[in-house]
Amino acid sequence: MKPIRVCPECGKYTEKHTCERCGRRTEEFLDGRRRLALSKLLSGILRHFPEEVKVKLDDEGFTDCDVHELAERIKKYWKNREYYRWLTGEHIIAVVETCPKGRFEIDEHGRIRARYGHSRRLSVRPTLPEAENVKELYHGTARENLESILQHGIKPMGRRAVHLTDDEREALITALRHTRNPVILVVDAERLRRHGLVPRKAGKNVYVVEGTVPPDCITRVIRNPRRSVESEKR
């Protein structure tokens, strides 16, 4: 993962060496290794195990403290806290503002939440905008799951919702995290709506659907997604 840089003039966080806002040369703020580790830790705390750092989440998924207090609780309570002695609230803000998928959100009180991906055991249901104009969505999975999915649909498994994307390449990247033999399922969003399933926008290219995506909403299977994505780039 790329380092996060900061503009010394306007304070904008970016991956670029020149600030898009004011044109100044940026300085490194958080190296790529720490950025990746912190992003994964935030995902874990905000989606699955907030109690491990003495944090409570409300119904919308927001923490009971601001990001600066969250940094202090991580340094005090997290089991591997010795690796996070450097952490401040500003590092959390930087990770949120530069997250390519828009996984996190900070409200006007400085509280943070994950926008999607929560475990079923947490009583969290974030309010997310309905994706009214999206027509086609993608879901990447392993080839060995295909027969079961075409028979039973795409299930949320341990999560509250099925994750989809409007970007075929993103679906491939997601699938490749779990398998060497990916396929991409193409989902008709209008058919979802006819089933009473509402696609909601949860991140920059991420959409969620509460419940199982029925098999008849899967209109196509891209069996060689690498070739498909490469041909789109040409």
Swiss-Prot record:
The keyword Transferase appears for this protein = yes
Q: Does the keyword tRNA processing apply?
A: no
| Record-linked Pfam families | PTS_2-RNA (PF01885)
At the top of the EC hierarchy, this enzyme's class is transferase
Q: What are the entry keywords?
A: NAD, Transferase
Cross-referenced SUPFAM superfamilies, in alphabetical order? ADP-ribosylation
Q: Its Gene Ontology molecular function terms? A: NAD+ poly-ADP-ribosyltransferase activity; tRNA 2'-phosphotransferase activity
GO aspect biological process, one term:
tRNA splicing, via endonucleolytic cleavage and ligation
- Which InterPro entries does this chain map to? Ptrans_KptA/Tpt1, RNA_2'-PTrans_C, RNA_2'-PTrans_KptA, RNA_2'-PTrans_N
Protein EC? 2.7.1.-
Q: Which cysteine pairs make disulfide bonds?
A: none
Name the PANTHER family on file: PUTATIVE PHOSPHOTRANSFERASE (PTHR12684), TRNA 2'-PHOSPHOTRANSFERASE 1 (PTHR12684:SF2)
Provide the family line.
Answer: Belongs to the KptA/TPT1 family.
Function per UniProt: Removes the 2'-phosphate from RNA via an intermediate in which the phosphate is ADP-ribosylated by NAD followed by a presumed transesterification to release the RNA and generate ADP-ribose 1''-2''-cyclic phosphate (APPR>P). May function as an ADP-ribosylase.
Q: What is this protein called?
A: Probable RNA 2'-phosphotransferase
